[in-house]
Amino acid sequence: MVVVAISGQPGSGKTTVAREVARVLKLPMVSSGSIFRELAAKYGMDLLEFHKYAEQNTEIDKIVDSIALEKAKAGNVVLEGHLTAWIVRPYADVCIYLKASKEVRARRVAMRDGVSFDAALREIEERERLNKKRYLAIYEIDIDNLSIFDLVLDTSYLSINDTVRISLDFICTSLNSKYMKNFC
């Protein structure tokens, strides 16, 4: 029962990498970020508003995280999300953390969301501040402590193809060693 958890900073490439890893490994992908965005839409809020709302309403994070935990317990899944690896670590075979410089991430988010660089930078900084505060308050998790990760990868100067290749090489080596069979 393979479980891969990919976490990382906003704009680091975690969703794109998780989607491609899931495709190659022929596993479903569950995105905590997508679940969070769906809930924001359901509540009629934009992402930043919903982050602020979630700060006051801890049940939001608990709903998202309980879905990730259920999927991890069931196995055979790639999970993606900012906090996901910390939540599912006991069930995960491989945990990867993606990071990049704030400027690179702001450029990526600006391009993805069709907003200015400055707006993307402000959103990233605010989301990170809110996430750090919320996760510490709800779970006593310091998201700056990356010691639970098997691989920490700086994607600042890597193409998406290089990031996926490095991630898959690491995942396949880890799974092949753990399960003594060829997964990839």
Swiss-Prot record:
**Can you say what this protein is called?**
Cytidylate kinase
Where does the chain bind ATP? G8, Q9, P10, G11, S12, G13, K14, T15, T16
Gene Ontology biological process terms, A to Z: pyrimidine nucleotide metabolic process
Q: Which GO terms describe its molecular function?
A: ATP binding; CMP kinase activity; dCMP kinase activity
Q: Which reaction does it catalyse?
A: CMP + ATP = CDP + ADP; dCMP + ATP = dCDP + ADP
Which UniProt keywords are listed? ATP-binding, Cytoplasm, Kinase, Nucleotide-binding, Transferase
Localization = Cytoplasm
Please report a single Pfam family linked to this protein.
Cytidylate_kin2
Enzyme Commission code: 2.7.4.25
Q: Which GO terms describe its cellular component?
A: cytoplasm
